[in-house]
């Protein structure tokens, strides 16, 4: 089955662990509240995550809430459902 990790991203030092999980074929739900007030660090984290997940790995990023993302490895897809449900977003929408 699919392993789904829960994580709180406090700063950029947590990004490599997220990428490792995705490389291993595991998903992650990431809370980013701690970075929301640090715009440059938030943007850097999103850029690194989206470059790896979408471009290098072929996975998907789903925006669950304003400060929460779900990172999916290749072979897993989020689909649009009801308006209140999560849906796939372009990485430029995360900025």
Residue ranges and their predicted role:
Residues 22-36:
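Short glycine-rich, basic-tinged beta-strand/loop micro-motifs
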Residues 10-14, 18, 38-45:
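Helical mechanochemical/support elements of P-loop NTPase systems and associated helical scaffolds
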Residues 20-22, 62-63:
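Conserved catalytic network of the ASCE P-loop NTPase/AAA+ motor domain
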Residues 34-39, 77-78:
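Short acidic, S/G/P-rich loop/turn micro-motifs used as interaction or catalytic elements
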Residues 52-95:
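Helix-rich interaction surfaces within compact, conserved domain-sized segments
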Residues 9, 33, 65:
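Conserved residues at beta->alpha junctions
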Residues 49:
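Residue-level signature of catalytic and energy-coupling elements of molecular machines
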Residues 1-14, 21-22:
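N-terminal intrinsically disordered, cationic/polar leader segments
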